Amino acid sequence: MPDIDALSRPRRLLVLSICCMSLLIVSLDVTALNVALPSLQRELGADVSGLQWTVDIYTVVLASFLLLSGSTADRVGRRRVFKTGLVLFVAGSLLCALAPSLGWLIAFRAFQAIGGSMLNPVAMSIITNTFRDPKELARAIGVWGGVVGISMALGPILGGALVASFGWRAIFWLNLPIGLAALLLTARYVPESCAAHPRRLDVVGQLLVIVLLGSLTFGIIEGGHDGWGSPLLLICFGIAIAALACLLWYEPRRREPLLELRFFRSAPFSGAFAIALAAFAGLGGFLFLNTLYLQNERGLGAFDAGLHLLPMAAMTLVFAPLSGYLVSHVGPRLPVLLSGVAITAGGVLLTGLTEDTSLAYLFTAYVTFGIGFGLVNAPITNTAVTGMPRSRSGVAAGIASTGRQVGSALGVAVVGTVLATGSRDTGWWVLAGCGVLVLVFGALTTGRWARRTAESAMARIAEEDAAEPARSAG
């Protein structure tokens, strides 16, 4: 296996292509599954809660293990963990395709998510270690972002076509050939790499994150159906609060914590995490509600429903690179504020939907929301790493990615629970509220004052890290 520094440019591009294959199957799996929800609901007799869990169990497990997978890859080898992730994801997809009931499907989705947690963050680490030249790395990340946009555009259409032709199980069958091809190519062409100073395993922190996310999501989905004051909801929220308190107490006391809470002293970093939560909660809720609206209320088939979502996905594809350009030239403030305005406006427009709403009005709402979501990703990544030293930027970006997944899970949980109470219009207002949060957090955490907090926070962290070896030696 050749050394990374000795790789030719064609070989580096091949490594990038292999990493993008993993991103493609994960992204297609998520976007295509949303279109299949009504078909799955009919065949397996699922209620709204069951549909929520089909989507959210994957996202919750993925978010819970993202940071662990990244640190494990740094320690035992990125190529090794990436291959393991592909094996688990493909095996999980096979099990999902064969699931005999809703309960088994949810369980297999959790298994699939463990593999998924080892793919995208580890693939990004492979890319950053393969492309050492800053300009080449910027172009590689641009290609990576383009694949996300392509999957969002193709996912609903491809998912709709597969469901219409072969049923919802075909979505999972599709992962097998792509995943196996990526596995074989990884074994042959991707070089191994490890971090020079890998972080230690934080078992307690990992367990607390799982308890926190699991109890919070479970409480919203299950407890919310019995009313927001139900005993189950209160118990779950109590467990979540206790887990959060333990996490806030325990993590600062570890020399190498799973969650680097000191980063939250930086206003741009805290803002990036909050914006990621809000924006992806809006996206998760948008895909969940619109799939059910188009197929159950407007009576569209799966393929037609996928086509109807194309304007939103197309705007995301178009405005994502524009956002990156704006961030590099004028900073993250303008695109994140425009994103907040567009997501809010899109959510407000969606509140007026009925089964007879004209396509012109519907597509206007979809285009507006798509513009907002297309603009938000680049500012999230940029504000997360603002002021961070290079050695810390990967950890910061990983925490921001966890925020994206947590937001998506909470978005589906909240709007699904609202929908189960018989109030779809309230669900649309939740999406508008997500846009307002993006706007507010963007305004507060992207100005000069915020940048100064990032500089002071990183200086303080550097001082603390420098003092730690001295205390240990003493």
Regions found by a protein language model. Name each.
Residues 176-195, 210-222, 239-254, 438-448:
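C-terminal membrane-cytosol helix-exit motif in multi-pass small-molecule transporters
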Residues 10-13, 133, 189-207, 227-233, ...:
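Short loop segments and helix-boundary regions at transmembrane helix junctions
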Residues 1-11, 195, 445-474:
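Intrinsic disorder in cytosolic terminal tails and internal cytosolic loops
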Residues 191-207, 253-261, 451-462:
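Flexible cytoplasmic inter-helical loops of multi-pass small-molecule transporters
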Residues 1-188, 320-323, 330-344, 348-355, ...:
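Transmembrane-helix bundle of Major Facilitator Superfamily
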Residues 49-53, 103-111, 166-174, 200-202, ...:
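Interfacial loop-to-helix junctions that mark the boundaries of transmembrane helices
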Residues 12-28, 33-35, 48, 231-239, ...:
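12-transmembrane solute porter fold
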Residues 4-12, 98, 198-200, 226, ...:
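Helix-boundary and loop/linker segments of multi-pass membrane transporters
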